[in-house]
């Protein structure tokens, strides 16, 4: 998922912040925020965000377990909880999970 919020003029300074929002068994969801700043201003403006999923693998390409993530800030907690809903939606759409099993996803509509 990639969301573009604002255009970035040529010559802007970009700051890219990437944080793991949730770790599952062998996969991690990484939330990326992109901020722009002009050369003449100190003010930063969020222009883009993206969500990626990575799978940890060993030297033979087999998935391996990743450490648990414990969110600290309110934003981290919000993204942590939303990550499970995104994962369940992805699994349902891929046919790897029955919609009836996607309890966190169903909770949005209850």
Stretch-by-stretch model annotation:
Residues 9-10, 21-110:
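HotDog/MaoC-like acyl-thioester-processing domains
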Residues 1-9:
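Small beta-barrel nucleic-acid-binding modules, principally OB-folds
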